[in-house]
Amino acid sequence: MYQDKILVRQLGLQPYEPISQAMHEFTDTRDDSTLDEIWLVEHYPVFTQGQAGKAEHILMPGDIPVIQSDRGGQVTYHGPGQQVMYVLLNLKRRKLGVRELVTLLEQTVVNTLAELGIEAHPRADAPGVYVGEKKICSLGLRIRRGCSFHGLALNVNMDLSPFLRINPCGYAGMEMAKISQWKPEATTNNIVPRLLENILALLNNPDFEYITA
């Protein structure tokens, strides 16, 4: 019988491509008995272009590599100090639709920020989470055979200047924000427990096992 347990992997700071490849391999080889997983990772500086991404949104990449991804959405930036959470879930088994998963991820971030006294909200016209008009968290998902991969990227205490080299998520002039603008002491290490607690609560508090790389 299937056990509702999630494996949570803390992967630390990693290059984008090997993690992306591992995520694809996991999704391609999983079956109905495979436990769901959540991967927590920070990436070395990289621009990733979404499946429908348009080249004109990459303005001046400079020395930062641009990598094609198969997630939804347009171009975004990943770098140290940004907490990425990849959600490798069997949506059929969890009876979750894609829109419900997007809402769940947005609510995870809204709830996490609320605990820090930061009022944030999703936007109907542009997926992600915003503080005022500024974007603090980006979302991008892919569904294959009823299973999700990719996920969210929450700006914690990162250098935001590389976002000026692109139109983030395809929006010219989109301003970005990070948690440390309101909470200077914020780090990915002290944000992860809150983020994890909030997503697990919205997934009905399954058992989980925390694995560090």
Curated annotation (Swiss-Prot):
Its EC number is 2.3.1.181. Keywords: Acyltransferase, Cytoplasm, Transferase. Pathway: Protein modification; protein lipoylation via endogenous pathway; protein N(6)-(lipoyl)lysine from octanoyl-[acyl-carrier-protein]: step 1/2. In the reaction, the free carboxyl group of octanoic acid is attached via an amide linkage to the epsilon-amino group of a specific lysine residue of lipoyl domains of lipoate-dependent enzymes. Substrate binds at residues 71-78, 138-140, 151-153. The active site is at residue 169. Disulfide bonds: none annotated. PANTHER family: LIPOYLTRANSFERASE 2, MITOCHONDRIAL-RELATED (PTHR10993:SF7), OCTANOYLTRANSFERASE (PTHR10993). Belongs to the LipB family. It is found in: Cytoplasm. Residues 32-207 form the BPL/LPL catalytic domain. It comes from Escherichia coli (strain 55989 / EAEC). This is Octanoyltransferase. GO terms for molecular function: lipoyl(octanoyl) transferase activity.
